[in-house]
């Protein structure tokens, strides 16, 4: 079981543009071979964590608050937020705040032998990293630059560096990069 940050990024390191839009990314959804990438990944996930900005983006773009059947995920989801957010009835969405470590322990128990997916914002992922809880970073790198926006991972990770586990190109414009997060004792 791993705690994984699975996301897409521009080559200049942004996961959303300065308007919090992902429209730049949608042009890559039809790349040959990509149709199985996300379903393969999501089949390994037993729990999800996201921040409030990601939760609100999903709510705005899917309408699941009015129609809970539009919520795409079938596993328990933890939303980290310091403020009250709208909720949808009948979904296993848990709202939490504060330290990620005790919530991570709960997620591990619920996920059993499956992975934990950290969705969206790099700051929340950074909190997991800072506590030694992040195991892998999986990035779909798109061949565009955004110039500004939401950063991929607003942390300085240089010693030890991430370990490249694999790189899979999809066409000429997109590559999936998979990294292991090394612990200081592993170098």
Regions found by a protein language model. Name each.
Residues 1-187:
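Enzymes that bind and transform nitrogen-containing heteroaromatic metabolites
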């Amino acid at each position: 079981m791993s705690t994984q940050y699975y996301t897409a990024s521009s080559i200049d390191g942004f996961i959303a543009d300065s308007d919090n839009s992902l429209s730049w990314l949608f042009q890559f959804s039809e790349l040959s071979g990509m149709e199985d990438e996300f379903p393969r990944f999501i089949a390994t996930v037993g729990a999800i964590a996201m921040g409030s900005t990601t939760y609100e983006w999903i709510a705005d773009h899917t309408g699941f608050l009015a129609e809970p059947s539009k919520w795409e995920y079938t596993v328990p989801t933890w939303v980290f937020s310091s403020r009250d957010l709208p909720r949808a009835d009948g979904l296993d969405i848990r709202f939490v705040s504060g330290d990620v470590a005790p919530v991570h322990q709960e997620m591990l128990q619920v996920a059993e032998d499956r992975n934990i997916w950290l969705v969206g914002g790099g700051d929340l992922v950074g909190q997991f990293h800072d506590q030694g809880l992040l195991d892998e970073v999986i990035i779909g790198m798109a061949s565009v630059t955004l110039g500004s926006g939401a950063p991929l991972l607003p942390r300085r990770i240089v010693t030890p560096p991430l370990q490249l586990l694999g790189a899979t190109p999809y066409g000429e414009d997109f590559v999936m990069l998979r990294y292991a997060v090394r612990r200081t004792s592993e170098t």
